[in-house]
Amino acid sequence: MNETTRTYDVIVIGGGPVGENVAERVRAAGLSTVVVERELLGGECSFWACDPSKALLRPVVARADASRVPGLDPAVAGPLDVERVLAHRDRMSSYWKDEDQAEWLNSVSVDLIRGHGRLTGPKQVAVQTPEGDTVVLTARHAVAVSTGTRATLPPIPGLDTARPWTSREATTADKVPGRLAVVGGGVVAVEMATAWQGLGSQVTMLVLDNGLLERMEPFAGELVTDTLREAGVDIRFNTTVTSLDREGGQDGEVRITLSDGGQLAADEILLATGRAPQTRDVGLESVGLTPGDWLAVDDTFQVTGVDGGWLYAVGDVNHRALMTHQGKYQARIAGTVIGARAKGEPIHDAPWGAHVATADHAAVPQVVFTTPEIASVGLTSREAEQSGRRIEVVDYDLARVAGAHQYGEDYRGRARMLIDTDRNTVVGVTFAGPGVGELVHSATIAVAGEVPLDRLWHAVPAFPTLGEVWLRLLETYRG
């Protein structure tokens, strides 16, 4: 077992999309940089979340959309080619190999050390390599923790022997389970229920709450509920799992006991019950922090409670916005501010300045890839009410937009825009309906840009597109 030492300007622990982008921005500022990664470069999003899940969902959603188009509906009535769908999923996940990411990291002159990195003190990281060697790293300026999150499992009796799916197994399974139970009602739960039901599984959703997608506008979850039920998904609200038992060994069915005393049998069970930070074993105790905690940060991503301003936490691990695109935004901010501080340059930390992540508080976009799609940015009406602002809620039936008529028959959807009446700007938008994911960036620009409604009135939408809903929302507001 060998021990070596190296010194860099910046050390990044975690080589997912966030860590890669921190490293690239820091290197662009002229600082020497190393990424430490214990699994695959590209992280959860590339191999176990965003990419494989959307590859499973795309043919399911595309078939649903095509079935509404006159003339196409008979052509798409049959079952999907599961083998080809899974092969496409494998390609989109690069067959769980990260050579391309490693080549990209090398192309931007960032070093890579494969192994488990742990903080051992201020600006110090020890890496245990797969070969059993130790590499002791010292940072001249900063260490950035970008280790992401892991699935959390509730303490259900029988959990260990039931071998439940988490999101990782749900996105990488090599066959369609005959019966799939999904515990949860959030984004992972509804997307995986959509995907596997569309691929031929009989899905039952066991939901603790009164509805799906409870953090979004109520109509979003209601529309998804209706469509899932029409597709054959059995959704049971106000339901908890009290015990699990997998009978007959590894391939046996799972017996699920429910809070009402009833039982359910499934071939697989997915627990989509939340995320926790990957901080249990990264050496937080060596710098006075608690292992397993989320890392609290300021708007430049310096970790609070650690002296010296050298420790940063970027991406899901800081619990600000658990989405890859927002983590990459944070990475661009963090990498830039680390470079500026290392050079002694002024820090522009006013709202919307170059060195602060103001959008984390005001303009986080999200798309849920179900049928129908859900897209949102900014505040919901519930959040707006809690904020104490004077808000006017503007709703519009998306089915009344000409572009929806072209999209297909029996289009169902809804749009909601929240207006801050004191500032005359948009502070939140939610769309629900087929194809609305591509509308979210226009909404993000309106919210992040704080575009006055009088100016937004001059942004003319093309006819006949779904984007014409912007005009209809503004007309509804203006009266």
Predicted regions mapped to residue ranges:
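N-terminal Rossmann-like dinucleotide/flavin-binding domain of flavoprotein oxidoreductases
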Residues: 2-6, 45-136, 140, 216-242, ...
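Core beta-strand elements of the Rossmann-like FAD/NAD(P) dinucleotide-binding domain
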Residues: 6-8, 132-142, 259-268, 307
